[in-house]
From Swiss-Prot:
Expressed exclusively in mitotically dividing cells. Highly expressed in young leaves and mature flowers. Lower expression in young stalk and in young and mature flowers. GO terms for biological process: DNA endoreduplication; negative regulation of DNA endoreduplication; regulation of transcription by RNA polymerase II. Belongs to the E2F/DP family. Residues 34-99, 169-250 bind DNA. Residues 153-163 have a biased composition (Polar residues). The lineage of its organism: Eukaryota, Viridiplantae, Streptophyta, Embryophyta, Tracheophyta. It holds the Pfam family E2F_TDP. InterPro entries: E2F, E2F_WHTH_DNA-bd_dom, WH-like_DNA-bd_sf, WH_DNA-bd_sf. It comes from Arabidopsis thaliana (Mouse-ear cress). Disruption phenotype: No visible phenotype, but increased ploidy levels. One of its GO terms (molecular function) is DNA-binding transcription factor activity. It is found in: Nucleus. This is E2F transcription factor-like E2FE. Residues 142-152 have a biased composition (Low complexity).
Length: 403
């Protein structure tokens, strides 16, 4: 946390800076491909999957497979969420879900930590200034004193290079960078809007290596995307330079998250191909209702096409009057024997129905084709003659003798 006063913070917010990469990154964010890969959209989908009742554990491998991204992208989101208390690390690639209700407590802790950090840095700077004045007086009185005696003093501080290296290594952490970024807003009432460039200068310092500075600015921009998707900050721009900036909104209740259209289409494809069986009951209800409708339609058609008994008997009598009686009708060489037709009464004016089993047993026609009868009798006589000759020449062995 920086030890700048509120007046200097105001100047830092409104002062222009020269980092063109951040503005170009914001322009790329509005393109289609960049938007689909942004951490903001990914965080919205992540929260839509896990911000609901019944979720206690979050697995990074499971989240990466459901969202269709690499696990390192999930790490970025989890680090930011962990810094504001939404998640807590439990094991490797396993996190405990705390929810948005833990955000106010985490922000309060960050505010208290930021105030203590500001007071500590102010106290250290005052001590360093006093020790520098004493060192100047001693060096003027003893110009040839060795550096070892200075380092052996009990009140001397360690060299500034070592703690700066430690701080630089710690600030590479995305979670720590997120906490320091939030402290800029909650530890000073003067700051409510800050540009991305000024936040990078306050948190990262003036780096001489431009490539390292670009990387750190991109990391800070990813943090801002995640916090913006959580409605903690809002993307805006400065009034003087129109550069990208961020406005602090704070925690105003739990927001509502919905899956993106791409993931919704993916879920619909899964249901279509049978990998998701949540719509089995719907399919069964549809099939049962359709079968009932088809059965009803068939019954209506049968009633519509059914012939009353009186009309059926009338048409049958007309047919007999045209072709004569059943006894006088000639069926050709295959004349059926005399038989009676079933005279069972009709029910519900439906079509006359014949009993198939009774037809097979009682009303089997007896064909009287003399030519075929003579031919079959000739074949039977020939077979009997051949069989008698064969049995006489080769008599069958007596099976009783072998017993």
């Amino acid at each position: 946390m920086s030890d700048l006063s509120p007046e200097r913070f105001k100047l830092a917010v409104t002062s222009p800076s020269s980092i063109p990469e951040s503005s170009s990154a914001l322009q790329l964010h509005h393109s289609y491909s960049r938007k689909q890969k942004s951490l903001g959209l990914l965080c919205t989908n992540f929260l839509a999957l896990y911000n609901r009742e019944g979720i206690e554990m979050v697995g990074l491998d499971d989240a990466a497979s459901k969202l269709g991204v690499e696990r390192r992208r999930i790490y970025d989101i989890v680090n930011v969420l962990e810094s504001v208390g939404v998640l807590t690390r439990r094991a490797k690639n396993q996190y405990t879900w705390k929810g948005f209700s833990a955000i106010p407590g985490a922000l309060k802790e960050l505010q208290e930590e930021g105030v203590k950090d500001t007071f500590h840095r102010f106290y250290v700077n005052e001590n360093v200034k006093g020790s520098d004045d004493e060192d100047d007086d001693e060096e003027s009185s003893q110009p040839h004193s060795s550096s070892q005696t200075d380092s052996s003093k009990p009140g001397s501080l360690p060299q500034s290079s070592d703690p700066s290296k430690i701080d630089n290594r710690r600030e590479k952490s995305l979670g720590l960078l997120t906490q320091n970024f939030i402290k800029l807003f909650i530890c000073s009432e003067a700051i409510r809007i800050i540009s991305l460039d000024d936040a990078a200068k306050l948190l990262l310092g003036d780096a001489h290596n431009t490539s390292i500075m670009r990387t750190k600015v991109r990391r800070l921009y990813d943090i801002a995307n995640v916090l913006s998707s959580m409605n903690l900050i809002e993307k805006t721009h400065t009034l003087d330079s129109r550069k990208p900036a961020f406005k602090w909104l704070g925690y105003n209740g739990e927001p509502t998250f919905t899956l993106s259209s791409d993931l919704l289409q993916l879920e619909s494809r899964k249901r279509a191909f049978g990998t998701d069986i949540t719509n089995v009951n719907v399919k069964r209800s549809k099939s049962s209702s359709s079968s009932q409708e088809n059965a009803t339609e068939r019954r209506l058609k049968m009633k519509k096409h059914s012939t009353p008994e009186s009309s059926y008997n009338k048409s049958f009598d007309v047919h007999e009057s045209r072709h004569g009686s059943r006894g006088g009708y000639h069926f050709g060489p295959f004349a059926p024997g005399t038989g009676t037709y079933p005279t069972a009464g009709l029910e519900d004016n439906s079509r006359r129905a014949f009993d198939v089993e009774n037809l097979d047993s009682d009303y089997r026609p007896s064909y009287q084709n003399q030519v075929l009868k003579d031919l079959f009798s000739h074949y039977m006589d020939a077979w009997k003659t051949w069989f008698s000759e064969v049995t006489q020449e080769n008599p069958l062995p007596n099976t009783s003798q072998h017993r």
